[in-house]
Amino acid sequence: MVTYALLGATGATGSSILRHLLHESPDSLRIQILVRSKVKLLQAFPNLQTTRNPQVHVIQGTSTDPDALSECLRNASIVFMCVAQNGSPIGTTLCQDSARAIISVLQQQQQSQGASYQPCTIVQLRSASLNPALAAQVPAFVHRIVSFCLFANYADIKKACQYYSQAQKQGILEYILVDPPTLHDANGTQPTGYRLISTESQATALSYADLGAAMCEIAHRQSEFHGRAVGVTATGRVRQAWGVLLRHLLEGGSARLREKIAQETVVDGVVFAFLVVLAYLM
């Protein structure tokens, strides 16, 4: 039996993956789901507890709880990492903290299982903005604005990806990075068409339903993509809603601007104090 682990199943990405697996799952699949709120998950998927194909096991806990993670990751060949922070709050470390916790649990499994240990594949949601080939398709000024506004979120994701890369070199895991464009229609349930890409042209928008289907395809074809970034582009119509995205950009940009101003104020203060002391000594 194939076992998939899903972290963050109540968010838009995790829900789309779970919905796709429930409707088009491979034969003999077991899904181990880690969520902060089992009640919230069952409200979104009321038939989950009676589902027999695939088998579903729900664990309530956080993505940094070693006991919950150990139960969720046990025997998993695929780990969908969909835990994410809404917006881009300064100092966020959710992704990197989760990555460290996952790697720690996998290290323990590797040590206990010895030669029989089989590394799982982490399917990590990233962003086309962090993929040089795909980011180059966006006007430079737009890319700079987005990178500035979402600096904290991107820094967190990049650090998590560095941890996965280091762990791969140690034989602890494999990883695949999934790079979609802007994501829309969080409540939509029907995919309208997508395609996996490398450096080809990428549409501006993608639905969450198509992202979920794409991540499931990537998991099915995991051996083709180990250690690589995979882009996703829409081939069908996408119901676009820019309000939430623009709000995240505005909030992230405002926070980043305040941080920059505060840093410059501190530097100016230190320089001024140094000059005062220097003048006094002279």
Curated annotation (Swiss-Prot):
UniProt key word Membrane: no
Domain of life: Eukaryota
Organism: Aspergillus flavus (strain ATCC 200026 / FGSC A1120 / IAM 13836 / NRRL 3357 / JCM 12722 / SRRC 167)
Function, as annotated: Involved in the conversion of averufin (AVF) to versiconal hemiacetal acetate (VHA) in the aflatoxin biosynthesis pathway.
Recorded metabolic or biological pathway in which this protein acts: Mycotoxin biosynthesis; aflatoxin biosynthesis
Disulphide linkage map: none
Family of this protein: Belongs to the avfA family.
Alphabetical UniProt keywords: Oxidoreductase
GO molecular function, one term: oxidoreductase activity, acting on the CH-NH group of donors, NAD or NADP as acceptor
The protein's Enzyme Commission number: 1.-.-.-
Protein's GO biological process: aflatoxin biosynthetic process
Protein name: Averufin oxidase A
SUPFAM superfamilies: NAD(P)-binding Rossmann-fold domains (SSF51735)
